[in-house]
Amino acid sequence: FIPDTENFQYRPTNEKTEEQLKIIWVFDMIIFSSDRHGGNLIIDNNDQIYAIDNGLTFGPDYIKAYAEFYSLKLPDTLIEKLSNFLANDDTQRILKELLMELLPENEVEAFFKRLNYIGQLIIDHGVITRNESEELKKFN
């Protein structure tokens, strides 16, 4: 339970919420979320967005939500965090071990392939294009 929140679906966006939505968009591509929509996002009084209902993830495909973010500059904080994570073998190993306790090996391997592919795109270019996102289909 997250107190003092409401459904985000009908709220207008601002700079702070748009940055968060871009990060959620990338996260959803990496975990292959097939059910992200405004109805499973909630927002608090400080404009902090929470992605809820993540049950349809790590599946055979992802939903192509938030198409307006293709080719837009992604937040510097996301680029920095992805760069740091991908440069840290120990952190990746720990995450892999934890995921292996919860998911089949093939899904964990696909997750890391998507993470590395998307992460490198973002680090190198700061954006993801629609064509590049279509490449994710080969990582499932």
Task: Report residues per predicted region.
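Phosphate/dinucleotide-binding and metal-coordinating scaffold of catalytic cores
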Residues: F1-N140
